Regions:
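Non-transmembrane, aqueous-exposed alpha-helical and coiled segments at domain scale
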Residues: 1-354
Length: 354
């Protein structure tokens, strides 16, 4: 079910439906229901967003979701901005999902609602203007589906051991580190356990040398208060985000080195730039938990913190004497039990705690 508060890109939706149907052998269109009031996102919204250049100064993705929402609010295009009115709607089951979801709940069905983006990117409670275009809190997800927040809920908050942000000047990120730093730490932990490194050291060294090459091309900008280049770099007022530097440095490397680095480095979905990454910050985690009030926590990317279990965990995994204190500390901060722990991208890498 795609609810009334969702934003749908018709071309991407068609591609994903075809892909899912081909991979599963099931016709997903027979099960998919879309609310007629769901918003419509087109390529023109992306074009307008990137043309303004604001996504560079704010570190946004430039996908144009904000532009699409503005059009929906203004009613620009006389119906063009809601899914029920577009030509492609005839290919899908378009129905009032508010009635369907509430009807299913009244009949005893369990409803699973998936939220989008990070809690601390909320437009109202996040570090504005470095936020997304809407509220990302659990109550907002229910409202977008037409469900009352008074309904009984079981909120599962997803926590990354190393949080990420979109590339560019995307706002404050406490305890930010570089991917080479994280990679070296992961390799060192694995080597102490007698295991092979995740990324070859020569690739990391080449990447850091490329970063130095990029940095050497920078000059101190005017009106920088007499700072030398190192001091200027450290000032957030003039600082280019690490992800932008990393993206530029990648151009200096050959394809084999980039392929080696891609075993760990995470790219943004749309722009394919290196994401920003940071160590888990206690204050940020506490604030996110306060806003979500989770009943349970799903801890992801545990393989970054404990790389000796890189993609090797199974449902019968037993926590060792280092993992247990780490998990208990997160449970203390979030005031919620950790129910799921993932050590890799697949379901076979998920450890379910009793």
């Amino acid at each position: 079910v795609i609810g009334a508060g969702a934003m749908v890109h018709p071309e991407i939706l068609a591609h994903e439906c075809e892909l899912v149907s081909r991979l599963t052998g099931n016709n997903i269109l027979e099960r998919l229901i879309i609310d007629p009031n769901a918003g419509v996102h087109r390529e023109e919204h992306t074009t307008r967003s990137t043309a303004s250049g604001r996504h560079y100064s704010m570190g946004a993705t430039g996908k144009g979701c904000s532009e699409a929402i503005v059009d929906k609010i203004k009613g620009r295009g006389a119906g063009y901005n809601t899914f029920g009115w577009i030509d492609e709607a005839s290919e899908y089951n378009v129905h009032d999902t508010v009635e369907q979801l509430n009807g299913a709940y009244n009949c005893g069905a369990k409803l699973l609602i998936e939220g989008t983006q990070g809690t601390l990117l909320d437009i109202n409670t996040g570090p504005y203007p470095f936020t997304t275009h809407k509220s990302t809190l659990p109550g907002a997800w229910m409202a977008e589906c037409g469900l009352s927040p008074a309904l009984p809920t079981d909120i599962v908050m997803v926590v990354r051991t190393y949080p990420i942000r979109v590339a560019g000047n995307s706002g404050p990120m406490p305890r930010e580190i570089s991917w080479p730093t994280l990679t070296r730490e992961i390799n060192a932990k694995r080597e102490r356990a007698g295991l092979a490194p995740i990324v070859e050291h020569i690739a990391i060294l080449a990447f850091e040398m490329a970063i130095s090459e990029v940095l050497s091309a920078f000059e101190v900008p005017p009106n920088s208060d007499g700072l030398n280049q190192e001091e200027w770099w450290d000032r957030s007022k003039f600082r280019m985000a690490l992800s932008e530097l990393n993206a530029a440095a990648l151009k200096y490397l050959d394809s084999s080195c980039v392929a080696e680095l891609s075993k760990l480095f995470e790219l943004t979905t749309v722009t394919r730039k290196l994401r920003r990454v940071a160590r888990l910050d206690t204050n940020e985690l506490r604030r996110a938990a306060m806003l979500c009030r989770p009943h349970r926590v799903a801890l992801t990317f545990m393989n970054y913190e404990f790389p000796q279990y890189w993609f090797e965990c199974d449902p019968h995994h037993s926590l060792d004497d280092r993992e247990t204190p780490y998990i208990r500390n997160i449970e203390r901060i979030t005031e919620a039990p950790i129910a799921l722990v993932s050590y890799g991208p697949g379901p076979e890498h998920i450890y379910r705690r009793a």
